[in-house]
């Protein structure tokens, strides 16, 4: 009996720590056009991820090396792409994936697929990253070095937002996973594009490499959670049906 009680208590402790409450903020109850999930349904990035690398650690040295590597690419074609990738607003996510997907993902050409991507954007970019971002409030590379990003549009706003994990990367990777499910024939191109969106954050100086790596983990968790949501399931099926018609 004592052993059973000990196991139960241990399990209760794990459950509490893994499914800790997400800090208050927007969710499907306040912005249903950008979320499918409630705060209580989202994964807890603070419980899932290790702390970000400390300044002076081996892992932080890698972050610094990747920052310098990315900075050298800013005046190249890849750097130009990174600057474009910084803007995911106003259909930016859908536009970013259209070429890799093989079809234009617009409200006109593929409204159901476009709606799916738009509606899940903050489940990945906000809910899945919120608790770790708010806890650690990690300084971003551009603020750490005092060097402007490759696209300064959101620089002032994001200087007050934690760097770890990367919200943009989470959006990009989650979108890539879902689009790969809709169009598996193009999965390699789609996933590569999703990976590139994350690396663009390093090149631009908005994020450290470890921010990006961590974001891909929470994005995968967010997509798994979304698959248990009835409204997401319905819209995903509509997107798949729409794609089947596009292929004909």
Curated annotation (Swiss-Prot):
The entry assigns this protein to a family as follows: Belongs to the class A bacterial acid phosphatase family.
* GO molecular function list: acid phosphatase activity
Which keywords does this chain's UniProt record carry? Hydrolase, Periplasm, Signal
Name of the featured protein: Non-specific acid phosphatase
Q: Which organism is it from?
A: Providencia stuartii
Q: Which InterPro entries match?
A: Acid_Pase_classA_bac (IPR001011), Acid_Pase_classA_bac_CS (IPR018296), Acid_Phosphatase_PhoC (IPR054904), P_Acid_Pase_2/haloperoxi_sf (IPR036938), P_Acid_Pase_2/haloperoxidase (IPR000326)
Localization, UniProt: Periplasm
A single GO CC term, please?
outer membrane-bounded periplasmic space
Tell me where on the tree of life, at the top rank, the source sits: Bacteria
Name the predominant localization.
periplasm
């Amino acid at each position: 009996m004592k052993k059973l009680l000990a196991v139960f208590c241990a399990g209760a402790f794990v459950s509490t720590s893994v499914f800790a409450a997400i800090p208050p903020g927007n969710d499907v109850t306040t912005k249903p056009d950008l979320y499918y999930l409630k705060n209580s349904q989202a994964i807890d990035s603070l419980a899932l991820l290790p702390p970000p690398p400390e300044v002076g650690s081996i892992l932080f040295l890698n972050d610094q090396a990747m920052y310098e590597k990315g900075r050298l690419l800013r005046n190249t074609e890849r750097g130009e792409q990174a600057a474009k990738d910084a803007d995911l607003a106003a259909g930016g996510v859908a536009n970013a994936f259209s070429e890799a997907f093989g079809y234009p993902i617009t409200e006109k050409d593929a409204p159901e697929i476009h709606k799916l991507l738009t509606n899940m954007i903050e489940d990945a970019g906000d809910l899945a990253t919120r608790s770790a971002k708010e806890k650690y409030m990690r300084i971003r590379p551009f603020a750490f070095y005092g060097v402007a990003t490759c696209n300064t549009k959101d620089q002032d706003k994001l200087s007050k937002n934690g760097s770890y994990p990367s919200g943009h990367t989470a959006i990009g990777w989650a979108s890539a996973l879902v689009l790969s499910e809709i169009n598996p024939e193009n999965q390699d191109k789609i996933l590569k594009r999703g990976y590139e969106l994350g690396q663009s954050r390093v090149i631009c100086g908005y994020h450290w490499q470890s921010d990006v790596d961590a974001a891909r983990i929470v994005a995968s968790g967010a997509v798994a959670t979304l698959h248990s949501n009835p409204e997401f399931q319905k819209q995903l099926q509509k997107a798949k049906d729409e794609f089947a018609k596009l292929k004909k």
